[in-house]
Each structure stands twice: as C-alpha cells, then as structure tokens.
Amino acid sequence: MEQQLWRQGCSFVVGVDEAGRGPLAGPVVAAAAVLPRDGTGLPSIIRLDDSKKMTEEEREAAFEALEAASRDFERTGVAFAFCVLPPSLVDEVNILEATMLAMDRAVQELSEKLRGGGQGGTEGSSPGALPLAVLVDGNRLPPRLLAAQQQQQQQQTSESSKFLARAVVKGDAKITAIAAASVVAKVTRDRLMRAAAEKWPRYGFDTHKGYGTTAHVAAIRKYGPCEIHRRSFEPIKSLVGWTRGEMGSEE
C-alpha cells in the first residue's frame, strides 16, 4: 500500500498508532511516523513489526534506531512525533476520545516537522496542506484527520495539495510506517510507566505497565488507587465511587 501511495504522488506516508487504551493506569500515547521509501535510512533496524509481537529489547532497539535516524531527516527520511495524554484527561473525556485526540496531535506535530525539514514548522497548520497520506491503525479516523479528508474530497484541489487519510485494520502488521509508530508509542509509554514505578513502587508498574493483572488489581484493592490510576475504569470506578465530572483529588 505504501509503494502504491508514493506512486500516486504522495510525498510522505505517515503511519499512526497508539499505546495504552486498555490499562488501568498511566497515560495514553499516540505516535506518527514516516520512513524512507527504500528503507536505506534504517540500516540498524533488523525488524519492525506490530510492537505487541516484539520483545521489549527489540522494541527498545528499534526505537533507538528510529530516534538516531530522525536526527538527520534530510539524509534518512525518518521522522516521528508523539503525544502523551494523562489519565485525568482519559477520565474527563473517555478513553476513545482521548486516543483520537492524541492521534490528531501526533499527526499535527509530525506534519509541522515535515514542513521544516524534520526540525519543526508552522504551528497550527492543517495536516491536509501537505501532499501526504496518513494511515491510522484501527477502524476509524481521528476527527481532525476525518475533517481534512472530507474537505479534500469536497474540493477540486491540485496535485500539490494531495491528501489522503485512511484507517487500516491491523495496520501495524501491514504498514511499515504504522509499525514504526507502534514502536514509538509503546516504548514511550513503557518508559513513562517504569518511571512511575519508582514513584509508586507498590503497584508494580514496571512489570505490567498499568494493565489489569491479578497482582495489579490486588494492589489497588489493598492500597487504593494512586494519582495515575484511571478513575473511569473498573474496578477503580466502583472502589472510589467515581462518576464523570467528579475528578477526585488524591488523599
């Protein structure tokens, strides 16, 4: 699919994915990534795949290689951006809306980087203004991307402003750029959860990364939720009697 889009005139094929929709604690992270057409800018990456199929060591190695390559975008054609949204926002708007917002923001930041040759660009500019294709893992597009796609379809625009946004089910196993975004999102979030484990060691965030394991749920029941637990997720919701609009404070 990526090769076909390049042949159709897209300058960049952006892959988008998220990490952290299901956990009981921690942020949701979305990432957007672009890779070179021929892969020559990624000599040290042996494997890019759906991050869930990779070991932690493989993900870290891939992330380090992506990060190193992105420092010389003009030579490598590698760039990425990510957005981290806190659990308080997840509780405020719900996890789906938070995920969509994070994806929109990651794409926005990356599009600004691409305008600036990988170093940043015009703040607030629309992702639809670049000749690019945005491929999102899953079955729906974030609102801003959907609006840009609809606007593109309604207007008879020139080739230079070509824009396409598409949701791709299981895209992290089909599209290399989505796989790269998957790695960036997962590694970024895992690192944040390991840091959280140092602040709240009794929950074991460094091992389960906030997911609802038996040990994690037992710790929540024993100690109560901490600052980064999602009050809108069960069993925390029932434990604290949370309802949307009542953002509880730490005791």
Model regions and ranges:
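RNase H-like, Mg2+-dependent phosphodiesterase core
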Residues: M1-E251
